[in-house]
Amino acid sequence: MSNQELKNTMSKSVEAAQRNFNTIRTGRANTSLLDRISVEYYGAETPLKSLATITTPDSQTIAIQPFDLGSLASIEKAIATSDLGFTPNNDGKIIRINVPPLTEERRKEFCKLASKYAEEGKVALRNIRREAIDRVKKSEKDGDLSEDQSRDEQEKIQKETDNFIKDIEKKLSEKEAEILKV
């Protein structure tokens, strides 16, 4: 695995952690809050964003306008049964969700969730590091690399891992600050 491949693989793990962070409520309306919602549509689970236009007319409201009005009830049900705690308002054409301000308890729950997502990202990075170091050790064992070259490569891999872990920690602290901001 080249250094570039290692960086690409690790940056994908960081991006996945960032996508997870984006699905956490912060007290302001955000369309990415609904990214994980799937709707039962003609017998198949379909992502909400494939069935409707999702907008934020103001900082406390999310508006969902289905492409097919027949899916309105299914979308409303999927939102109501999700773990987001939203109550959808259906006016026959558009579903509106009022995003209430977060309680202190809910903010703490979301901070824990963000920490969990960050830890998942770090574990993924460590797994990538382990695989890369195992390849380097195998190359050394096969005689393709000297002991010094192997140690240098392992140090480079560790430095890259540390940099990406710092990146996740930075994103986590930004998200926690955003969640805790009243």
Swiss-Prot record:
Name the family the entry cites: Belongs to the RRF family.
Q: Which domain of life is it from?
A: Bacteria
Which purpose does this protein serve, as stated in its record?
A: Responsible for the release of ribosomes from messenger RNA at the termination of protein biosynthesis. May increase the efficiency of translation by recycling ribosomes from one round of translation to another.
Q: What is the originating organism of this protein?
A: Prochlorococcus marinus (strain NATL1A)
Q: Name one GO cellular component term.
A: cytoplasm
Q: What processes does the entry annotate via GO biological process terms?
A: translational termination
Task: Return the protein name.
Answer: Ribosome-recycling factor
The record's section on InterPro entries has: Ribosome_recyc_fac, Ribosome_recyc_fac_dom, RRF_sf
